[in-house]
Amino acid sequence: MNVAKVIATCFTKRTLRLKSSLVGDPLGYFGHSQVLRSPEDVVDLIKYNISLEKKINPGISKRDLIIVNNDVGYKNGNNFLREISGLKIPYGKIITCNRKNIGMSFGAYDYAFRKFKDRYDYFLFTEDDTLIAKKNYFKIGIDIFNSYKKAGFLAYIHSTKVDKMYYKPLNLNRKNAISAHGATGLSSTEILKKVFKKYGKLPHYKGNDYQKCITYGEVGFPSSFIKIGYKIIDLPKGLVLTIPAYDLMTKKKYKKWPSNIEIFYYYFKRTIYKIFSISSLTLSFYLKILSCAKNMIAPNN
C-alpha cells in the first residue's frame, strides 16, 4: 500500500494568532494558533515539518510527503523546495511542486491529487501550520476510515456543522451541511476519484477571493463527499493527531476540547454581543465597557 501526505504551503506572512480560539459546531479549539511573521518563517516551518516526518513512524511502510507551494515568487522558499525535492526520508521521499497561487490550500490539494492520483491508495491533506505528527498517524487513520460503512472523509481536526450562509452557494441543507475544519483529513483514492469525476476537480475556488476560497474549498471539498453518498467521520473524541504548529514548536500543551465553564462563557459572551449589536450606539457602548474592564484587570504599565 502506497500513501501520500499532502502539505499545502505558501511563502507569505499569516494572520497572527498567539493562541487557538473556540470555533465550530461542536465547539472546540479549532481556530488554530499561528505565528508566521515573514516568508522566511514559513521556510523554517517547512523544515520543522520535515524534521518531524523523519522522526515519526506513520505506521505505513510506504509514505511519501508531497509539499505543494502556492507560488508567490519568494525565491528563497522556491529554491529551498527545489533543493529538497526527491530527498529520501524514512518510509518514503519528499516531492515538491509549485503552482499558481489560486484557491488557497484547497487548490493545492486538488493539484496534488490530479498529478499523483494513480500512485497512491490514500491521501492525507493538511496545511503547513497544522501538524499531523503522532506515532502511527497514517495507520490509525486508515484503520478508523475502513471501520465505518460509507466513510468518505476522516476529519483529522474535527467535523463541523456549517452556517446557513453556505447553503445556497453550495446547494446544502440542514441534513448535509457538514464540513471539516481546514479540510484536513484522509480519504481513499477510490472515493476521491468519484469526487473528481463528479466535479472535475477536488472542489476549490479558482481565484483568490478569501471568502469564496473558504466557501468552495474548506466547506465545499469535505461536503462534496456527503453529496455523493458518503459520510464525514471523526477521530475518537480523546484522540488528538493534529496539533497547531506554533503550539508544538513552543512546547505549549494543546487543548482540543473546552470545559463546560468555557462553553458557557463563550455562548454567554456571544449572546450579550447579539443583544448590544442591535444598533451601532449600543454596540459602541458595550465595546467601551469591555475596553474599560480589560484595562482594570490588566492595566498598561
Mark where each language-model region is.
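Conserved catalytic core of nucleotide-sugar-dependent glycosyltransferases
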Residues: 131-209, 214-219, 223
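A short acidic (Asp/Glu
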Residues: 17-20, 76-81, 107-109, 134-139, ...
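C-terminal catalytic/acceptor-binding lobe
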Residues: 22, 202-301
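Short beta-alpha junction loops
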Residues: 68-73, 129-130, 157-162, 238-241
